[in-house]
Amino acid sequence: MSEEKPKEGVKTENDHINLKVAGQDGSVVQFKIKRHTPLSKLMKAYCERQGLSMRQIRFRFDGQPINEADTPAQLEMEDEDTIDVFQQQTGGLC
């Protein structure tokens, strides 16, 4: 089994991907991230930009929760994919 590896010093187009993070309010924030960078970096940057806490929101991709250690490569994300953000629901009792 031979794996195709890019030549050293040659940057591949596939090294970075652009991801969109869509909030419940319809806002969309774009991020450029390396395929093997943990998504926690994107999640923290989104929270800082929106003035939110990581405890207040949840990130989902294709309906599945995203863990901080997940990478775009692990989740098979492609360029221009969208991550959805949801407010954390708390309580339920009056």
From Swiss-Prot:
Alphabetical keyword list: Cytoplasm, Isopeptide bond, Nucleus, Ubl conjugation, Ubl conjugation pathway
UniProt cross-link Glycyl lysine isopeptide (Lys-Gly) (interchain with G-Cter in SUMO), position: 11
Superkingdom of source: Eukaryota
GO biological process: one example: protein sumoylation
GO cellular component labels: cytoplasm; nucleus; PML body
Cross-link named Glycyl lysine isopeptide (Gly-Lys) (interchain with K-? in acceptor proteins), sites: 92
PTM comment text: Polymeric chains can be formed through Lys-11 cross-linking.
One of the Pfam families matching this protein, by short name: Rad60-SLD
Primary location: cytoplasm
Gene Ontology MF terms in the entry: protein tag activity; ubiquitin-like protein ligase binding
Domain Ubiquitin-like: 15-92
Localisation: Cytoplasm; Nucleus, PML body
InterPro entries: Rad60/SUMO-like_dom, Ubiquitin-like_dom, Ubiquitin-like_domsf
Residue numbers covered by the propeptide annotation in the UniProt entry: 93-94
Family (UniProt): Belongs to the ubiquitin family. SUMO subfamily.
Quaternary structure and partners: Interacts with SAE2 and UBE2I. Covalently attached to a number of proteins.
Record's function text: Ubiquitin-like protein which can be covalently attached to target lysines either as a monomer or as a lysine-linked polymer. Does not seem to be involved in protein degradation and may function as an antagonist of ubiquitin in the degradation process. Plays a role in a number of cellular processes such as nuclear transport, DNA replication and repair, mitosis and signal transduction. Covalent attachment to its substrates requires prior activation by the E1 complex SAE1-SAE2 and linkage to the E2 enzyme UBE2I.
Protein name: Small ubiquitin-related modifier 3
Species this chain originates from: Gallus gallus
